[in-house]
Structure formats: C-alpha cells, structure tokens
Amino acid sequence: MAKIIGIDLGTTNSCVAVMEGDKPKVIENSEGHRTTPSIVAFTDDNEILVGQSAKRQSVTNPEKTLFAIKRLIGRRFDDPIVQKDIKMVPYKIMKADNGDAWVRVKDQDKAPPQISAEVLRKMKKTAEDYLGEEVKEAVITVPAYFNDSQRQATKDAGRIAGLEVKRIINEPTAAALAYGMDKKRGDSVIAVYDLGGGTFDISIIEIAEVDGEHQFEVLATNGDTFLGGEDFDLALIEYLASEFKKDTGIDLHNDPLALQRLKEAAEKAKIELSSAQQTDVNLPYITADASGPKHLNIKLTRAKLESLVEKLVERTIEPCKTALKDAGLTVSQINEVILVGGQTRMPLVQKTVEEFFGKEPRKDVNPDEAVAVGAAIQAAVLSGEVKDILLLDVTPLSLGIETMGGVMTKLIEKNTTIPTKATQVFSTADDNQTAVTVHVLQGEREQASANKSLGRFDLRDIPPAPRGVPQIEVTFDIDANGILNVSAKDKATGKAQSIVIKASSGLSEEEVAAMVKDAQSHAEEDKKFKEMAELRNQADSLIHSCEKSMKDLADELSEDEKKGIETAISELKEAVQGTDKTRIEDKLKVLTDASAKMAERIYAKKSSEGQAAQGQTQSQESTKPVEEGVVDAEFEEVKEEDKK
C-alpha cells in the first residue's frame, strides 16, 4: 500500500516525514538537510530553483527569488497586511484580475499556490527518493488561525504539485500529536505555542484516554497569521539600515541587492544571538557612492536585539490569554508547554513563555520537525497504520451570514469541534422578494463588513410572498479539513443552491535555518572576547532600561536630570562602538550613577502602588490563605520536577 506522507509547509522552511512501522521518520532532502528553505527562484535560463539552491542565489537575483509566499495565501491585494508586505520584499506583488494578491516574475503573473506547489513538489520528490516509490497522497499542515480561503488555497497548491491532500491539519495540533504519541497514557492539558517564520498560533489541547483510544481534543485556538520570524528579521534590518544611514547618509532601502544581503545577515545574526551574547554584522562593499565603496560593520548584542523585538514577543501573549479564556482554563491548569517553530529558539521568547505560563517549556520537542512528524502520524491514522489515535480539531473563527442591517449572524461559533454541521432558517426582508443573496462570512465582529468575506451566492425563483413568510434554510457544513460548504434551500419549493468556498491565493513555507556556533581556538582570546561581549550587553541593557524609564517618568524628572542622563547615554553608546574596555566601563559607571536617582523613584513609586493594592486585597487574602498558598507551591513543584 502506497504511503501517505506528512508535510509541514512553512513560511520560512518546509519539512517532510513518513511513518515507518510505529515510528515517524523525518526525511533528509537531496542536500542532506532535514528542512528545506521555502524559497523558489526563477533564473534567466528559465530554470526553477527550490530550497537551498534558490536561497544561495537570492543576493544576486532578489527580484526573482520568492520567499515568505505563505503570508500572501488567501489574501486580497487591498488587504492592509499585503500592503505592508509589499514594502518588505524585493519581488513584485501585484493585483490579480480577481482582486487577489499574486506575484509577478519575468513578466508572468503567478498565484501563490503555484509558487507553494514548487516547494511541495520538492517535498514529494524528497519522500519518493527515500521510499523508492511514487507518492500521491499527503497530509499538509497549516497555521491553526488560517481562515477558510487560506486552507482551500493550500489544498490547491497540493493539487498543483500532483498530490491528493487527504487532510489539512493545524500545526499546533500536529505538534501535540508528535509530543503525545509516545507518552504514557493518562489525561493532561498542554499548551502548544507555535511561533514560526510568518505566523503565530497558540492551541490548548487535552490529551485523554477515551474507550482505549488516545484522544487529542483541541479545546481552543488563537493566533496571528502575520507575526513570525520574518517580522523579527525586519525589525533588525530596519535597525541596521538606519545605523548605516546615520554613518554614511545612504539609504539601503533603495538598493534591492543591498537589502537582500542585509536580510541574510540579519537572519544569521538573529540565529547566532540565540547562543551568543554578541555578534558582528560585517558586509563589505554593501554599496558605493561618488567617494568610493562603503562597508557595513555593526556590533550587535543580544540585549539590543531583544529591545528591537520586545513588542513583537509581547504581541503573542494576548492570543494566549484569549485561548485560555475560550478553553475555560487558568494558567495553573496547564500541565505542559510545548514550543514549536524556529523563532522559539530565541531566549527572550522562551523566557516570556515561561513567565506567562509559570512553568518551563519542554525541551524534548524539536521545534523545526514536530509539525511534520505530527502530520506523518495523522497520515498513518488515515491509512490505517495507526489505529488507536483520535484527533478532534476545531474551527478557529466563527462562521455565519450577513443579515438585515449589515449584521453578521453566526451559525457556527469559533472553537467548535470539526467536522460539524449547522442549520438555521431565515426569511426575506422585503415583500414579494423572489431572490436572496447568501453572503458567507468568517470572523468575530458583529458588523458584517468588518469580517472576512468568503463568498456569496443567490437563491432565486422564490415564490412572491409578504416579507417574513418564505422559509429559507441555510446549512453550513465544515469537513475535517476545516473547509466549508454552504447551501440554501427554499422550504416551500425545495429549490436549493450551494457553494464550496473557494480561494485563489497561495502560499509557501515555514521553519528556520540551523544555528551556527563560532568556535575560537585560543582560550585567552575567548575570555577577552566574552568579557567584551558581556560588557557591551550590559551597556545595551542599561541604555534600553534608562530610555524606557525616562519615557515613563518624563514629567517627574528635572531638566538637569534629563540632560545628565541623556549625555551619559550618548557617551556610552559611542563607547560601545569602540574596543576600549576601560572606556566602556567608565561610561557604564557614569550612566549607572546618573540613573540611580531615577531608579530610586521607580522603586518608590512601585512600592507605594504595591502597598495600595495590598491594602485593597488584604481582606481577600485573609479569607483564602490556604488556597493561594497551594497554588504557589504547585508552581514551584512543577518547575523543580521539570528541571530534573
């Protein structure tokens, strides 16, 4: 029997896996890598390059090298998110005849699923080379927060690549399958925090033993389909470009070639700073002007990078709160936290997740491979190789139709287990109305126009009657892929009309490149290098906290205090650019002393606020000291056990 493969089609990287016996196997590509860059390039010789070969030539061919296509999938050209993307990428995004966002390469317009299909074809070939037989079927993963259009476009991409897509499953759910398949049976609730190359998802999943089956039930899901590693790269690119402009007066945004080199360097620096405290961004001959060639050389510390992406990491917390609320759970009821997606390797992300959930995330799940492994497990369930696993996924967004007054009437609420079916009876708004338009919507807003329009169709030849008399039965049917079929029927005549929601946008991939560690040969040089890196890190950290505090206390500082701190910050920034350790230490001390009074004020302010809050809750604390004590102890206990 032919194998069904599991594919993680990511924004940045893709991965393919297959079940061998009772073990999932991640398959290496022809270059020997377990993940493949989700990049497609078109050369002047009419050759199509996919993966590493496309990535290697991106600097010399930026306008015909397509990356992060997944961020365009199922989106209209006029979507503000697409407009933002246009400014971020060197290739051309244009408006298709149907209003969707497509790409233009070598005077040809291509839909995103066509580009994504090239990556899927590479994954298919990788699996076929390993298995020694043709592969025709696949399970493909998508972000949990993908809407109906985006899911349909993913299926289209599979079809273009010559694959029958047996099932579309959500990435966090796939990761939960990968984590839970070989764990001991028993009930537990896990949070899957998935921050990939272009999208963010959080899913709360209950793993339980039900009638001898290992049941994975998604309780709630939330996310942001335009937040990921690409945004972290962009924040760093903007910083590097602005620093270069300060030094030279040249804006690198006007040079696609330089911008592509900057993107590669930013991605590399970001990865290095997950394991190192400091790195050098060194790009010789980045550009030139009348005076000659220009070189970019900027020292970057982990603290500086963290200050640049702090707000992006904070954006992931609100969806976590919403998912917990929708699941009807508190943080203390989560047993384990799983991290998925290459961007979760960043220490700041791990720290933020640990602080929010009150427990250390598990380290035994490979963030780059877990999703593909889960897809392979689901593929084995569909083919009958694995028999005792039941997966209950949900629809991430509410579905409904537009009714009188421009209101969205929901037929299926968000976080409803799929497959599911819902029927509701509506009537006409005017006397003698002979046709109704069914406008299908997806989203959470009351106002119809504020939600995503999935499509519309007309039910005609309704017998004339006073308003409110005809009975039109509207049925929403969501299949196991999360794809919607809508039908409407006039109960009097039996006349019916239906629509399968179709999208004509497309996508690409997700996942992150491997880390590079620089080994130094001489121990003494290592020691000096580390000391300087830590010192710069300390300086950047202090600068960031001082600048933040000055904003918070702007009204409470005297002009002299402000001037003193600003001067100290400026001098320390200048010292950090050099290599004189003593000078950095001196300027660090000056800023520390200058900000001491400000720190005392913050402490005093927080202390007085804390005392006020304590006074308000004192009576509550006295009534339930035991319960609160137990919760605290439980947090500590879980942490300790995790560490063992």
Swiss-Prot record:
It holds the Pfam family HSP70. Acts as a chaperone. Residues 609-623 have a biased composition (Polar residues). Residues 605-644 are annotated as: Disordered. Induction: By stress conditions e.g. heat shock. Residues 629-644 have a biased composition (Acidic residues). One of its GO terms (molecular function) is ATP binding. The modification Phosphothreonine is found at T199. Belongs to the heat shock protein 70 family. Disulfide bonds: none annotated. CDD domains: ASKHA_NBD_HSP70_DnaK-like. InterPro entries: ATPase_NBD, Chaperone_DnaK, Heat_shock_70_CS, HSP70_C_sf, HSP70_peptide-bd_sf, Hsp_70_fam. Keywords: ATP-binding, Chaperone, Nucleotide-binding, Phosphoprotein, Stress response. This is Chaperone protein DnaK. It comes from the Bacteria.
